[in-house]
Amino acid sequence: MSIDRIKNYHLSRRKFLASAGAGAAGMAVGVPWGAQQAFAAGLGDKELRTVGLSVTVQERILNDFKAKSGVKAVSGKADIFPNTQTELLAGTSAYDVWETIGERLPAVIATNKITPIATSAMKNWGNIRDTFTKADPKWDKKNQIVGQIWKDDTQKELWMVPTVYNYDSIGYRPDLVSAEEASTWTALFDKKFKGKTGLNVDPLIAFGEAVLAMNALGLLKVPNPGNPDKASIDEAAKFLVSKKKDGQFRALWGDFGELVNLLASGEMILADAWQPAVMAVKAQGKQCTYAVAKEGYRAWSIGNSAITGTPNMDAVVAYSDYWLSGPPAIAVSEQGYYSPTTNIKSAMDKDKYAFWYEGKPWKGATDRGIKEGDLRDGGSLETRAKNVAYWHQWPDEYDHLIKKWDEFLSA
């Protein structure tokens, strides 16, 4: 992939996610909410203008919210996080809510571009998962999602209301690579697979994975791969450059279709992958699996942040509360992500919930390559949550990391 294509890869991913999301959302619309439906009254004079990735900014979801909330208008723009962050820092007033990712919150909090949302204003908040309210002793609080989203330790106001999260890993071809070989981040850099591995073009992803691998190989000892210091960034950059020059990578991928095609063809047999991409390869009738890396998963969460000065704050709160109910939670779950609320259990078909969340066998007709008796790769949500290496976070040495990433791209 050329540098120009790397800079523009997000567009193709958005196109895919828009189409995939529309299908999933379509299945969700019309699901009864029962006691979980809860909105502020008197929204008829409000509108909801949102911006974010197409993972969450989906037309069918917005239309369903409009119908159920009574807001007079909704609009959504799909764009990548850096672009929106630049717009916000420049002072745009075009949006009411940014559907952002936890790791980017520090930049907009420090510049007063977002305002917190009170949990007391959301009737569905009571069923949020412990992941977002209780710190895991495995990491410092600030290095996990619970330390990113709250205004303070009273946990009464949120900088970001979580709506989607997942644990990312390695996608591989089990007919060409054994499960044992693929069960480590070092596999992406193993000479045995020279010319047949793929590396994501997002620098925060690539550097974290390189650090995970180097830790496993005894080349580094970085306790928090999501926030390496300058010296560790320098070593990881040297490692990445040497692998690139040796021809280790079949592709520096960012385009969803490219990833799927390369894995399906066997030109690339290992890659750091999005789980929906692995499903897309399986849907073509090819063997493809999401690995359980011994070093652990990369964890992340997307959610709603209210933009400071919005004239539609009540609509933002209602939209955030809506995300903690049935239809949107079902839509993202059937794409292969997780909903942060336990409300999903009563809203989703019980057999589908059992497959996506509880590690139970698939029941019913084949769907996107998932056949009767298949299990979700990695097992249940509980099992996967216990195997997280680190949560994505904003690195202290972000500028230095980006400088070294540019050197890698130019090598």
Question: What do these predicted regions represent?
Answer:
Residues 82, 109-258:
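Extracytoplasmic ligand-binding site segments that recognize negatively charged/polar headgroups
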Residues 90-99, 113-114, 193-195, 265-270:
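Alpha-to-beta junction loops
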